[in-house]
Amino acid sequence: MSLQTLPSDAADSRPNRPEDVQALEADARLRDDIRLLGRILGDTVRDQEGADLFDLVERIRQTSIRFHRDEDRLARRELEQILDSMSTSETVRIVRAFSYFSHLANIAEDQNNIRQMRARTAAKIGGSGVLADTLAHAKAAGIGPDALRNFFKTALVSPVLTAHPTEVRRKSTMDREMEVASLLDRRERVALTEDEAAASDEQLRREVLTLWQTNLLRRTKLTVLDEVANGLSFYDYTFLREVPRLVNVLEDRLEEDGDQAASELASFLRMGSWIGGDRDGNPFVTADVMRGTLRLQSSRVMQFYLNELHVLGSELSIAAHLADVSEELRTLAERSPDTSPHRSGEPYRLAVSGIYARLTATAEALEVEITRRPVGKGRPYESVKELQADLDVLHRSLISNNARVIARGRLRLLRRAVDCFGFHLARLDIRQNSAVHERTIAELMDAANPGMSYLALGEDARISLLTNELRSTRALVSPFVKYSDETMGELNVFHAAAEAHAKFGSDAIPQCIISMCKGMSDMLEVAVLLKEVGLVHPSGRSAINIVPLFETIEDLQASSAIMDRMLSLHDYRRLVDSRGSVQEVMLGYSDSNKDGGFVTSGWELYKAEINLVDVFERHHVRLRLFHGRGGSVGRGGGPSYDAIIAQPGGAVNGQIRITEQGEIISSKYSNAEVGRNNLEILAAATLEASLLHPRQSAPRREYLTAMDELSSLAFRAYRGLVYETDGFVDYFWASTVINEIATLNIGSRPASRKKTRAIEDLRAIPWVFSWAQCRLMLPGWYGFGTAVEQWIAEHPDKGMPFLKELYKEWPFFRMLLSNMDMVLAKSSIAIASRYAELVPDEALREKIFGRIRREWHSCIETLLDIMGQDRLLQGNPLLERSVRHRFPYLDPLNHVQVELLREHRAQNPDEQVLRGIQLTINGISAGLRNTG
């Protein structure tokens, strides 16, 4: 298997800029790496499966290229004949070969990205999202180090990991792939001798062979705690070191321009998590699972601290008779239980031993598992602040005795890590659907007030009842009433949250998120439940943030009015003021897209932000937006930097939280260097959006009006297809892998909210996932072409020139089209036509697919016209080449998937057929690099 047959990517013109030359050189190396890995995989397939299978792979690939290029009918028939002639066993092995090539190509691409990052850094070439570049812009704008330090005192940048089931790879596969990446990296960094190069080749072959002989698929369904463990692995790979390192690097850059004696920079970068706390639609996230999650998180960070202290103790071999130490350091050393005579004159080592002993005692008190043991008994730390105080003693002693360079080593990283991660590691959000809270409150209220029917009350009556309950000092829950299992389950979760605050600190669970929030009562119900466990007090204090999540188009439109009334409500406003006058609001990208389509979802989210900013400014409350974005464009995905910069003025304001989901977590954070760059991008974009254009000039009124009209037209086109076309549900279930996705064992959560086939009840992830697999990516573009055509027809005086102006002048519109450009480049109407053939009703197939095909062509034509491009991704040549490189290995997987689906749905009970389908889903996901 080789890339020798791929088209050449020679430059269209001679490059002039240094960065262009570097990009071309890096691209040439990328091709070399892909050829190397492709050759090794091909040799592995030939050795393990025989020359006949290898030749079959090549025949399928070549025929697929002809079909993709021009929908060659002869190629289609030839492909069908080849696939029909294969046994199930051959099919499975063919799928594995193409899938693994996609996996290996991804590794090569990731290494190429690292290579280019290093080249830019070495050449001091700035780029979007590079923190140094952003700081230079701030300096040029007259924003000095002191102003930046003040900004970061209240800033918050928080990536939030979720367990959304879009990562189809097993951890075993990811571990092997990381070894391949490490070997490629070493070849890049080190000039190898001939023997070393041969050994490196052999190691690569060994890893690829191990991959070939490793199961791509999970045999059993993941549990919630499995998902927690998978999420925690990224702390080992990246977060535990790179989060504190990034804050320290920023601190150093500010010191270069300011006072080196200035106070330390606030730790503005905080990790969040939903894994083990997200109960919306997942019955397996219980109070006990949440407790287990918190213990696992704490165990991981405690083990990290103990390992660092162990190494720090060996490093700080400073003898008391050779260097002065502070009195407080001597006191700390004297408290150490370490009685070894070898360390009697080494106060720093004794002090570290004492800290180590106290930390292990703390882990034991928190019921957290650790593998290391102390040299003696210590007293547990009451809080993380006590641990910080002891580490500060070490720091001050080193600084006061002219050992600043030592203080800035491992100790500095550890002190920053403790500040960032505490004893809890990540801030765990708890989330539940508003309907569950409503049923819980209804049962409690009806039991406490005989004759009441809470569910029959109107919104105003509920608000009055709930605010009275918030002020009441009596308990609503009675020990003499037997409540339903659902109600007890909810109450137990809130009790577990209160326990977490007592054990790990208030940062352990700082947010309670309300999914499908539709009114004020949804938020007040949660406040009352929190009061029952002591996290909200009748006096108006709250130990936790109550966060509404607005998800549907209708709810986004109502969000600012709801928050306006909430902030005007005295009893709720007291709770907000007790939280520093900061109110978080979460915006859902996934369900709004499924509800109203890509264009309308993006526009309603943007308008909701504008309106929320205005409301919060009137109430003098700080707005923190939490963006619930997925990996795919159909669920709000796309480049993070562009997304943050395109926010309306005032929407970032120094604080932002963003979900990182599924396959996006591994692509961004499984490699420390890539992870550092992605964290830097988030920090830089937040800084730039907040300080450099905090109140960027509002878009012109005619821009907003045009976007309103385009959105309305796109909404009608999308809803007309998805919700108003007879037979669409049947078409969707027949032409996609929606049924088969549920068999993948990639997550603990069910795929649908209810056991129906209705689109309304389907979760956004399998909805988007299914359209990606058949290569239509419909949620990422449908309706735009029709909207533009109709808008131009209605506005002949403005027409296309006005839309081109919109694209040139307005970051929001530019980002919207850029994301569509990427999605459409990965789509293939030729491949999609083969999935349409799976619909048994020919009239239905032609009616719906014909409509989709026309919209696809219209969308591409109008998009290219507005962007001034001749082809998709013309403005992003690296991504264009990446996508084009993938098709020869991605398309065959789609062809095989169609044939396997046809066979499986013909009531073939063969387990190998289902396994083959699952393998194609895995391979296509890898080839697309984002799925749901």
Curated annotation (Swiss-Prot):
| Active-site residue list | 164, 594
**Reaction(s) the record says it catalyses:** oxaloacetate + phosphate = phosphoenolpyruvate + hydrogencarbonate
What EC number(s) does this enzyme carry? Answer: 4.1.1.31
Its needed co-factors are:
Mg(2+)
| Keyword Ribonucleoprotein appears in the UniProt entry | no
Keywords of this entry: Carbon dioxide fixation, Lyase, Magnesium
One GO molecular-function entry: magnesium ion binding
The cross-references to SUPFAM superfamilies, in alphabetical order and at most eight, read:
Phosphoenolpyruvate/pyruvate domain
- Any single Gene Ontology cellular-component annotation: cytosol
Q: Which GO terms describe its biological process?
A: carbon fixation; oxaloacetate metabolic process; tricarboxylic acid cycle
Q: Which NCBIfam families match?
A: PRK00009.1
User: Could you tell me which PANTHER family the record lists for this protein?
Assistant: PHOSPHOENOLPYRUVATE CARBOXYLASE
User: What job does the chain carry out?
Assistant: Forms oxaloacetate, a four-carbon dicarboxylic acid source for the tricarboxylic acid cycle.
Family of the protein in this entry: Belongs to the PEPCase type 1 family.
The protein in question is named Phosphoenolpyruvate carboxylase
Q: Which organism is this entry from?
A: Bradyrhizobium diazoefficiens (strain JCM 10833 / BCRC 13528 / IAM 13628 / NBRC 14792 / USDA 110)
Q: Which gene produces this protein?
A: ppc
